[in-house]
Amino acid sequence: MDDFSSISLLSVAMLVGCYVAGTIPLAVNFSEEKLKLITVLGAGLLCGTALAVIIPEGVHAIYEEILEGGHHSHGQAGVVEVSEAKGDAESVLSGGGKHEHSHEQLHACIGVSLVLGFVFMLLVDQIGSSHVHSTEDPESARVTSSKITTTLGLVVHAAADGVALGAAASTSQTSVQLIVFVAIMLHKAPAAFGLVSFLMHAGLERNRIRKHLLVFALAAPVLAMLTFLGLSQSSKEALSDINATGVAMLFSAGTFLYVATVHVLPEVGGGGHSHAASGGNGGKGLSKVEVVALVLGCLIPLVLSVGHHH
């Protein structure tokens, strides 16, 4: 199968899978309590996904070239043990000034990509909320901007995923494409579920939720196709040099972390800052069952990622 048909197939699968996962909370009628519980579970899924799936995948993609280099140096000696390959990679990294330098660069690259993603969402959030605050009263403005930022953050994140998949497809390595695709699907399905349950909890009508979901589901496939089609041969080579797949995934992890921790979690926990002032429970904070759901949500992506070996 050529690169174009494989990326088309992966894009369609991503669109359908993501949309179907997002319609599950819409298809079932939940009571207020169950909806809150599902929202908490969705928030946990978002956090666990960012920490247990996206960041490790991005780091793996960035270091893959060095690990591969260690692997190939033993190519003639037959089968190489994984531990030997790892030792190789370490010796490649530590041996000689040039490799030391590239090691430092990779470390910086990981941090910079994550921070840029987080700061980008922070700025988008501030710009978005300043527009909303000027028109409405503070409380409804906070809720509205929260809905917008959550959707926007996840769309930006999905777009970065799409770029990662497009860049991976342009390498012509089927294994890389499949790994990136599985990684993206592992967190896009829970993210779609989390987004829809959060928007339902925030009181959006169902038609608008479906529109939000469609935009989110379309972002990654569209960007994957555009990235793949827009890359010339020379830029493909340049991309594999700077390891664009890993950088794009880490950038999207930064946006994901912002959405999960700054928006969804405080919203679910009863408006974050407000419950400290109000004192007592008064419906604020999380019940024991909700805490269990949150922890469970964080652990599910971890279990899934452990199950999916490279």
From Swiss-Prot:
Q: Which UniProt keywords apply?
A: Cell membrane, Cytoplasm, Golgi apparatus, Ion transport, Membrane, Mitochondrion, Nucleus, Receptor, Transmembrane, Transmembrane helix, Transport, Zinc, Zinc transport
Q: Which reaction does it catalyse?
A: Zn(2+)(in) = Zn(2+)(out)
Q: In which tissues is it expressed?
A: Expressed in brain, liver, ovary, and testis.
Q: Which InterPro entries match?
A: ZIP, ZIP9
Q: Which Pfam families match?
A: Zip (PF02535)
Q: Note the topology in the membrane.
A: Multi-pass membrane protein
Q: Which domain of life is it from?
A: Eukaryota
Q: Membrane-spanning regions, if any?
A: 7-27, 35-55, 108-128, 148-168, 178-198, 212-232, 246-266, 289-309
Query: What is a single molecular function from GO for this protein?
Result: G protein-coupled receptor activity
Assigned GO CC terms? Golgi apparatus; mitochondrion; nucleus; perinuclear region of cytoplasm; plasma membrane
Q: Indicate the principal place this protein occupies in or around the cell.
A: Golgi
Which cell locations does it reside in? Golgi apparatus, trans-Golgi network membrane; Cell membrane; Cytoplasm, Perinuclear region; Mitochondrion
What's an example GO BP annotation here? Answer: zinc ion transmembrane transport
Q: What induces it?
A: Up-regulated in the ovary by reproductive hormones.
Described purpose of this protein according to its UniProt entry: Has dual functions as a membrane-bound androgen receptor and as an androgen-dependent zinc transporter both of which are mediated through G protein activation and are required for the androgen-dependent apoptotic response. Upon androgen binding, mediates apoptosis by directly activating a stimulatory G protein that leads to increased cAMP levels and MAP kinase activity and which is accompanied by increased intracellular free zinc levels.
* UniProt family annotation: Belongs to the ZIP transporter (TC 2.A.5) family.
Task: State the name under which the record lists this protein.
Answer: Zinc transporter ZIP9
Read off the lineage from the record. Answer: Eukaryota, Metazoa, Chordata, Craniata, Vertebrata
